[in-house]
């Protein structure tokens, strides 16, 4: 097969790829210089929609409605956008070999692609129950959610199993968002996770108690402290029951699993430095190999604010790291410099009529403020994290846009404060910074 050659290649077609393409266009990339190679069949889209509006029973989001960059208020980049800019969108193409020394990528179909500068935007893949050797984990109607194909399969199952029963395995982002959207589809939901409370990597027990209570009121049955150890099926291979480690057996027409993800670094193993499961980069997302950059979920980068190296799995960082890398690529070509990446960690979620945001670092002592009663009609609450006498993190449920900006600012500025002061003042403390 003929070899294709580009000045710049982005491998991966998710959020980072789409935002990188926009920055390449802003920086004046010439027609024919840039290619995006993606194993997905569609142009880059805003992935968070898949666990939210894509699954709504009415008024569901569909492509081309949520191509990047609409998630951050930007222009919607349809396939035509890439064509107009002279960017090659090479879809349904999986790269199976990467030789960084010879600057060559090879696809599953045997096509060869040469590049001068490579941006690795491969993201993560979901951990599957079969990875842990769970019996029956390959039964039909056990779903994972990462790509649009996964969401389409789940949509079909929701139609086929109207008013059925679901078991959601996992108490993180996917577990919480999908339990909510399954209830909106009038599906009976059991949610199972091993930890003592939901979202344990971010939530404290106090925050989690609100969401668990709220979900319970919405009809989600939460089972904590155990895991799925096996599945029984109907003769047609569809899942029938979920066996739990504590001996309980749950009926299920649909199972949705969200037990974490792992970075897709396999192509580059032994060729680039890795750290904390990801590809190690500097503050410009340059890897240990010249002319090779890594962005988004796959990059382990210096988090300047906290003087440490981290890997962050979140759409906000996927967008911003992609833009930073492309700015750095053009600056280095022009003999100029750009500022180091100075990221404020940010996480958010929306489910039912809830909406929370978190900024900063969840370390140190905590203080909960506001009304965190799940039975309250006017629930609105938050939490601060204090370390060495300074605020380092802030969480807010049901905040206004101004209040959300205020908690972001307080996490960035890190003003001194006492627990008593914050308990008394609550959100008003952040609002006056």
Swiss-Prot record:
Domain of life of the organism encoding this protein: Eukaryota
Reactions the enzyme catalyzes: 2 monodehydro-L-ascorbate radical + NADH + H(+) = 2 L-ascorbate + NAD(+)
Q: Which residues bind NAD(+)?
A: 171-177, 195, 201, 260, 313-314, 348
Expression sites by tissue: Expressed in leaves, and to a lesser degree in stems, roots and all stages of fruit.
**SUPFAM superfamilies from the UniProt entry:** FAD/NAD(P)-binding domain, FAD/NAD-linked reductases, dimerisation (C-terminal) domain
Q: Which GO terms describe its cellular component?
A: cytoplasm
Q: What is its EC number?
A: 1.6.5.4
Where, by residue number, does L-ascorbate bind? 319, 350
Name the predominant localization: cytoplasm
Subcellular location(s) per record? Cytoplasm
- The UniProt record lists the keyword Cytoplasm: yes
UniProt-annotated binding residues for FAD: 13-16, 40, 47, 52, 95, 146-147, 297, 315, 348
The broad enzyme category this protein falls into is oxidoreductase
Among the GO molecular function terms of this UniProt record, one is: oxidoreductase activity, acting on NAD(P)H
Q: Which residues bind NADP(+)?
A: 173-177, 201, 260, 313-314, 348
The record describes the protein's role as: Catalyzes the conversion of monodehydroascorbate to ascorbate, oxidizing NADH in the process.
Task: Give the record's family classification.
Answer: Belongs to the FAD-dependent oxidoreductase family.
Name of this protein: Monodehydroascorbate reductase
Taxonomic lineage: Eukaryota, Viridiplantae, Streptophyta, Embryophyta, Tracheophyta
The record's gene field reads AFRR
């Amino acid at each position: 097969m003929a070899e294709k050659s580009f000045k710049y290649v982005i491998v991966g077609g998710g959020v980072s790829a789409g935002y990188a393409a926009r920055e390449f266009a802003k920086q004046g990339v010439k027609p024919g210089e840039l290619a995006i190679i993606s194993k997905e069949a569609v142009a880059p889209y805003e992935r968070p929609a898949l666990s939210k509006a894509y699954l709504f029973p009415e008024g569901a989001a569909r492509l081309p409605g949520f191509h990047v960059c609409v998630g951050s208020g930007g222009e919607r980049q349809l396939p035509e956008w890439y064509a107009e800019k002279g960017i090659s969108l090479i879809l349904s193409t999986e790269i199976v070999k990467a030789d960084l020394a010879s600057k060559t990528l090879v696809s599953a179909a045997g096509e060869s692609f040469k590049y001068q500068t490579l941006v690795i935007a491969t993201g993560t893949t979901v951990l599957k129950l079969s990875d842990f050797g769970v019996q029956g984990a390959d039964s039909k109607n056990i779903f994972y959610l990462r790509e649009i194909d996964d969401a389409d399969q789940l949509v079909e199952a929701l139609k086929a199993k109207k008013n059925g029963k679901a078991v959601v395995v996992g108490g993180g982002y996917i577990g919480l968002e999908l339990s909510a959207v399954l209830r909106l589809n009038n599906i009976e939901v059991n949610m199972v996770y091993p930890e003592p409370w939901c979202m344990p990597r971010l939530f404290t027990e106090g925050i989690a108690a609100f969401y668990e209570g709220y979900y319970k009121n919405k009809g989600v049955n939460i089972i904590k402290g155990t895991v799925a150890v096996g599945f029984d099926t109907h003769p047609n291979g569809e899942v029938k029951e979920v066996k739990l480690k504590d001996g309980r057996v749950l009926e299920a027409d649909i199972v949705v699993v969200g037990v974490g993800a792992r970075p897709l670094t396999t192509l580059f193993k032994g060729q680039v430095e890795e750290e904390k499961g990801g590809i190690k980069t500097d503050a410009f997302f340059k890897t240990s190999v010249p002319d090779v950059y890594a962005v988004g979920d796959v990059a382990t980068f210096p988090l300047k604010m906290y003087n440490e190296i981290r890997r962050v799995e979140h759409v906000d960082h996927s967008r911003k790291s992609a833009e930073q890398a492309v700015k750095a690529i053009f600056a280095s070509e022009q003999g100029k410099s750009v500022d180091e990446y100075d990221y404020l960690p940010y996480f958010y979620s929306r489910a039912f009529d809830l909406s929370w945001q978190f900024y900063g670092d969840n370390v140190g002592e905590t203080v909960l403020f506001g009304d965190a009663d799940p039975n309250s009609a006017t629930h609105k609450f938050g939490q601060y994290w204090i370390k060495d006498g300074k605020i380092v993190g802030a969480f807010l449920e049901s905040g206004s846009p101004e209040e959300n900006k205020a908690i972001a600012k307080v996490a960035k500025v890190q003003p001194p404060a006492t627990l008593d002061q914050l308990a008394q003042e609550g959100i008003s403390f952040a609002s006056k910074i």
